[in-house]
């Protein structure tokens, strides 16, 4: 926590000639920053009788909350599911490179792996604040190994697991300590899954439903046990059927706890999800849509063979497959590309597209007071965009951490 006195004495930055995303609208207002947080200018004027120490003209551009990616498996040759002696350096590389795509916070994601990989990797990726070194780490997303064999997708079958008699202890034996974990994806139809969901939720860990053959009733029961997220909607789950819509049916279910918002990840890369499916999901439940990249180590590398955990992946153009198959294996589209494709495919408002990559993931993780918003008091993590939503600059805690060459003075 920053000291109030220290913050009060810090320099005040005023970002002018901009449109800021606040309250679901793009407003022609200035953005004020001090001590790494968004400042209320009225308090500055009337209570402290101060003005800005520095003004920065944004040239009419958009200022939106920094993007938050809650499912990213690696990128730029780094595979988070590879048990190396220096996992941290790989995470740092990805954290630095994704700044150019407007991402200010992320959840490094591990795909299904043997226990020894989790035991070696998980302790090496702690929660970390963002800054000039790169985007902040909000905690790990462990996708598998407690998932369906039928809907395993690119996850290696040899390492899939079901829950043993003492289910939560079995999970701990698989993963090791959970201090660095923020999200766990599991299949709710697995025996004893509900006691695991309750135990994880009690520890403040978000439970996501995915890689599953669960019917709607099983999915609803999982939500009552504490699940709040769906991993890459439509992918690796039963297809929608009018008599039993499966997990997809959670978007419009009337059998959920009162006031509970179900969030769901969407890979809007132009490959994983047909534009019509994107439109259906968004129109059915817009406030729960969370854009994710599901990016793999091949992000930024081009065609050829790469790894993803224990599997080989082949990239051909804009698509990644498990080598030798036509099974999709994550995405190679960065977050800003997903935002632009989502906007174009759904015809939604620019505000909605931006909130799907910022506010909604923050709400999913319970961080909406500090992340995913430009409200007063929030962290000054934001992205500067042109009218076509190309990233011009990225700020973390009010500090410029990346700038496009064309935007440099």
From Swiss-Prot:
Entry annotated with the keyword RNA-binding: no
Which pathway does it serve?
Answer: Amino-sugar metabolism; N-acetylneuraminate degradation
Q: Which reaction does this chain catalyze?
A: N-acetyl-D-glucosamine 6-phosphate + H2O = D-glucosamine 6-phosphate + acetate
EC number(s) in its UniProt entry?
Answer: 3.5.1.25
One MF term from GO for this chain?
metal ion binding
Pfam families referenced in this protein's UniProt entry, alphabetically: Amidohydro_1
In this chain, a divalent metal cation is annotated as bound at 143, 211, 232
Task: Name the enzyme's class.
Answer: hydrolase
**Residues at the catalytic site:** 294
Q: What is the effect of changing residue 294 to N?
A: In a colorectal cancer sample; somatic mutation
Which metal ions or organic cofactors does this protein require, according to UniProt?
A: a divalent metal cation
What UniProt keywords are attached to this protein's entry? Carbohydrate metabolism, Hydrolase, Metal-binding
Q: Which GO terms describe its cellular component?
A: cytosol; nucleus
Cofactor detail note: Binds 1 divalent metal cation per subunit.
One GO biological process term is:
N-acetylneuraminate catabolic process
Residues binding substrate: 154-155, 235-236, 243, 269-272, 328-330
Ligase in keyword set: no
* Annotated family: Belongs to the metallo-dependent hydrolases superfamily. NagA family.
Function of the molecule: Hydrolyzes the N-glycolyl group from N-glycolylglucosamine 6-phosphate (GlcNGc-6-P) in the N-glycolylneuraminic acid (Neu5Gc) degradation pathway. Although human is not able to catalyze formation of Neu5Gc due to the inactive CMAHP enzyme, Neu5Gc is present in food and must be degraded.
- Name the record gives this protein: N-acetylglucosamine-6-phosphate deacetylase
Q: What lineage does the source organism belong to?
A: Eukaryota, Metazoa, Chordata, Craniata, Vertebrata
């Amino acid at each position: 926590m920053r000291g109030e006195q220290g913050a009060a004495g810090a320099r005040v930055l005023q970002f002018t000639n901009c449109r800021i995303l606040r309250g679901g609208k793009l407003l022609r207002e200035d953005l004020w920053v001090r001590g790494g947080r968004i400042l209320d200018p009225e308090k500055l004027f009337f209570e402290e009788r101060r003005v800005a120490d520095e003004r920065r003209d944004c040239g009419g551009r958009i200022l939106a909350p920094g993007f938050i990616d809650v499912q990213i498996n690696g990128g730029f040759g780094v595979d988070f599911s590879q048990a190396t002696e220096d996992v941290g350096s790989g995470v740092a590389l990805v954290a630095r490179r994704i700044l150019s795509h407007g991402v200010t916070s992320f959840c490094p994601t591990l795909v299904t792996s043997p226990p020894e990989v989790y035991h070696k990797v998980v302790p090496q990726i702690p929660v970390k604040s963002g800054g000039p070194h790169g985007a902040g780490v909000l905690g790990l997303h462990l996708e598998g190994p407690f998932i369906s064999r039928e809907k395993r997708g690119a996850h290696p079958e040899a390492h899939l697991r079901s829950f043993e008699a003492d289910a939560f202890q079995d999970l701990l034996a698989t993963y090791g300590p959970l201090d660095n974990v923020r999200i766990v994806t599991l299949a709710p139809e697995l025996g004893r899954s509900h006691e695991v969901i309750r135990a994880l939720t009690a520890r403040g860990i978000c439970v996501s439903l995915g890689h599953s053959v669960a019917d709607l009733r099983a999915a609803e029961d999982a939500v009552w046990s504490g699940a709040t997220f769906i991993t890459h909607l439509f992918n690796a789950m039963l297809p929608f059927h009018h008599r039993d819509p499966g997990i997809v049916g959670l978007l419009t279910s009337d059998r959920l706890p009162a006031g509970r918002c179900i969030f769901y990840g969407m890979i809007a890369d132009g490959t994983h999800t047909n534009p019509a499916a994107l439109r259906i999901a968004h129109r059915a439940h817009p406030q729960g849509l969370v854009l994710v990249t599901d990016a793999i180590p091949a992000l930024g590398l081009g065609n050829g063979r790469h790894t993803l955990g224990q599997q080989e992946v082949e990239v051909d153009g804009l698509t990644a497959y498990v080598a030798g198959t036509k099974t999709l294996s994550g995405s190679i589209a960065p977050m800003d590309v997903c935002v632009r494709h989502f906007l174009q495919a759904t015809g939604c408002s620019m505000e909605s597209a931006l909130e799907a990559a910022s506010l909604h993931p923050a709400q999913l993780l319970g961080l909406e007071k500090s992340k995913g918003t430009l409200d007063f008091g929030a962290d000054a993590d934001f992205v500067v965009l042109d009218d076509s939503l190309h990233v011009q600059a990225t700020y973390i805690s009010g500090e410029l951490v990346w700038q496009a060459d064309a935007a440099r003075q």
